[in-house]
Design a protein with these regions (language model features):
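Structural preference for beta-strand elements that scaffold enzyme active sites
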Residues: 5-9, 36-38, 58-64, 81-84, ...
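Catalytic alpha/beta core domains of metabolic enzymes, predominantly
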Residues: 115, 123-272
Length: 272
């Protein structure tokens, strides 16, 4: 938040319990510019693997928790950097309180990760479908719950697979509150489609000055997510590293293989 740089996040596609594969993927992503990495914690074996993973990586590790709050408690005991909980499936107040207590004790931030595909039933009944207002209401309900127990080390995400909904939710939230925001369009699909949705959604918010961390969600290798995130930040004027390639779209006046040349240059400079 504040004057800090917008950070790039991705998520491992490996089973977290496979420590070697997960560590290898995290370090590969970190080498090309990933600054925060999230892993799925589906069961106790995933939670138990966290300590070994943390000891072999150099960037913060976030535990993605759904349904079973006890996995958040186990992750917190094993050196996790942040815990993401989903308000739509984490359970009742007593379970949230248990997560808050351990995170407060160990100084672990919590991300309230609202998702349009898993909103609480009462919000769906109230709004009819996952509207921007429904996403924001869910976020504030859980912010108030965490604040009730004196917990403020929180960031929020309100993701939707519909770009206008995600953008409207982030703008509405920011107009009412200044908690840090993690932004991204979820379930965007294959690379070409996903890049367009993410550039529109994330890019428009970044140009508004909204967003503290970003993730480009693609049905592809997470490496492509990191490259895309870097390009979005550069296009928004928020990342100065690397090279901005300026090239003609070509027309009948072109006398060289410009497309081939540009592709060679792009490949050579991709990791800059």
């Amino acid at each position: 938040g504040g004057s800090n740089n917008v950070l790039i996040q991705s998520m491992c596609s490996t089973p977290t319990k496979n420590v070697a594969a997960t560590v290898n993927q995290i370090n590969q992503l970190a080498a090309i510019g990933c600054q925060i990495i999230r892993v799925a914690v589906l069961d106790e074996r995933d939670a138990l693997a966290i300590r070994d993973i943390v000891s072999q990586i150099s960037i913060p590790l976030v535990a993605d928790i759904h349904f079973d709050y006890r996995l958040a408690l186990a992750a917190a005991e094993r050196g996790i950097s942040k815990i993401r909980i989903n308000p739509g499936n984490i359970g009742g107040e007593d379970r949230v309180r248990a997560v808050v207590d351990v995170c407060k004790d160990k100084k672990i931030p919590i991300r309230i990760g609202v998702n349009g595909g898993s909103l609480d039933k009462k919000l769906l009944e109230k709004y009819g479908h996952p509207t921007a207002e429904a996403l924001v209401e869910s976020a504030f309900e859980h912010l108030e719950l965490l604040e009730k127990y004196g917990f403020y080390d929180t960031c929020v995400s309100m993701k939707s697979s519909t770009v206008p909904t995600m953008v409207a939710a982030a703008r509405l939230f920011r107009s009412r509150c200044d908690y840090p925001l993690h932004i991204g369009v979820t379930e965007t699909g294959p690379v070409r489609q996903g890049l367009i949705k993410s550039a529109m959604g994330i890019g428009s918010l970044l140009l508004d000055g909204i967003g503290d961390t970003i993730r480009v969600s693609l049905t592809d290798d997470p490496v492509e997510e990191v490259y895309a995130a870097k390009d979005i930040l550069k296009a928004a004027g928020l990342r100065k590293e690397g090279v901005n390639i300026i090239s003609c779209p070509t027309c009948g006046r072109t006398r060289i293989d410009l497309i081939g040349l540009v592709n060679q240059v792009d490949a050579a400079l991709k990791d800059c």
